């Protein structure tokens, strides 16, 4: 790989603008990245990060007037091939691999080695396998070039994408939310690899909503807001307050602050005793009180989501009892749960929660449209007003209620789904990874909604893999391990809710876990 002078920018994007019909996505944005630098790019959803990266990758063409320079020389990137030839590689959140091809075939895609007569010769798969062995070994891959990509884990597939970038001699590597599907161990391995690539002189643009990752990796951080460049901070000047203020343009004080009164331990809303599904959930019990926010933490695979779906009636129970308001609740289906005042926000809003091709109005109304029936016909005006009220109450950013929900940012999609649940007037709300894939501003608004619900006497269960979030919003925390509740923190236990205590309980790694249990 060609080495560049680290004191000179490798990439300069100057005055980049992009206009879509009726929307100005970027307005004169500039970005400078040096070789051997991890440069994070932050901003709320809709700030323009993806548009800027798609211009760099050749997927979009910028408006006239801006320019892109590599090693100080202006360059035209008029398509993905031009970006690749310029040394730019992008690893998107949705990986771009062919699962039915081998690792080597994916690495060489579009550059296949052939026998005989140039482009018309037969593909030389053996030569391609030999040709990518070195890069796989260099990156620490424990799979071979002839492995089918479809048999690899998400983390391994991500490694194939990185190997392809390195093999094409990319000098600028863009990574868009790369840790979203990864476990903690896989994330650590990815960070080790990113630092290795930085040491080799690559310029890395890293996009993430996760503050902890930004602090751990970044040499510098640039912030976009509403399609405009706000500023760049060096590592030494990073702080949550400054970053959040730059991203949202307003003060978000007390980001995780509990703003509801202490719950009444005598007002029990939900009681779960020894429930099991015959698989992941192996006998769990919990209590939830009116006005309480109960956090559920644990490692991936601990059974948190499965427990939530079991309580909600989305999965059958093989044993155990659930009481809602002191009365036994059969919970044979989600409809039963909703009718009883118990609702569940799924962790996968796009596949299990929202109707992406339907409007915001219809998504909000779909659980309560029966209320609008008059003589066999729906009162559309009433449903439209309900949607407008929900949009205002939850600060959903949409031009109008008839826009397709699939066109919204992740944070606004999440608030549409929350609106639908809240229209049922629940007594108990289970939120499974409520801020996954949403930006800082939307997170703050979701935390406000949680606090408002608790103040109104709703019992809220929050399942989250982000420990600062769990610690910040929850009155008590239950930690799951291997399908069971391993212990409880906060509340009557007196045990402080800390990251160390949660990890100890989740892993069973210390006597602290046993003591808390």
Swiss-Prot record:
<dbReference type="GO" id="GO:0016887">
    <property type="term" value="F:ATP hydrolysis activity"/>
</dbReference>
<keyword id="KW-1278">Translocase</keyword>
<dbReference type="InterPro" id="IPR003439">
    <property type="entry name" value="ABC_transporter-like_ATP-bd"/>
</dbReference>
<comment type="subunit">
    <text>The complex is composed of an ATP-binding protein (RbsA), two transmembrane proteins (RbsC) and a solute-binding protein (RbsB).</text>
</comment>
<comment type="similarity">
    <text>Belongs to the ABC transporter superfamily. Ribose importer (TC 3.A.1.2.1) family.</text>
</comment>
<keyword id="KW-0472">Membrane</keyword>
<feature type="domain" description="ABC transporter 1">
    <location>
        <begin position="11"/>
        <end position="251"/>
    </location>
</feature>
<dbReference type="GO" id="GO:0005524">
    <property type="term" value="F:ATP binding"/>
</dbReference>
<keyword id="KW-0547">Nucleotide-binding</keyword>
<protein>
    <recommendedName>
        <fullName>Ribose import ATP-binding protein RbsA 2</fullName>
        <ecNumber>7.5.2.7</ecNumber>
    </recommendedName>
</protein>
<feature type="domain" description="ABC transporter 2">
    <location>
        <begin position="263"/>
        <end position="507"/>
    </location>
</feature>
<keyword id="KW-0067">ATP-binding</keyword>
<feature type="binding site">
    <location>
        <begin position="43"/>
        <end position="50"/>
    </location>
    <ligand>
        <name>ATP</name>
    </ligand>
</feature>
<keyword id="KW-0997">Cell inner membrane</keyword>
<keyword id="KW-1003">Cell membrane</keyword>
<dbReference type="GO" id="GO:0015611">
    <property type="term" value="F:ABC-type D-ribose transporter activity"/>
</dbReference>
<keyword id="KW-0677">Repeat</keyword>
<dbReference type="Pfam" id="PF00005">
    <property type="entry name" value="ABC_tran"/>
</dbReference>
<dbReference type="InterPro" id="IPR003593">
    <property type="entry name" value="AAA+_ATPase"/>
</dbReference>
<dbReference type="InterPro" id="IPR027417">
    <property type="entry name" value="P-loop_NTPase"/>
</dbReference>
<comment type="function">
    <text>Part of the ABC transporter complex RbsABC involved in ribose import. Responsible for energy coupling to the transport system.</text>
</comment>
<keyword id="KW-0762">Sugar transport</keyword>
<dbReference type="InterPro" id="IPR017871">
    <property type="entry name" value="ABC_transporter-like_CS"/>
</dbReference>
<dbReference type="GO" id="GO:0005886">
    <property type="term" value="C:plasma membrane"/>
</dbReference>
<dbReference type="InterPro" id="IPR050107">
    <property type="entry name" value="ABC_carbohydrate_import_ATPase"/>
</dbReference>
<keyword id="KW-0813">Transport</keyword>
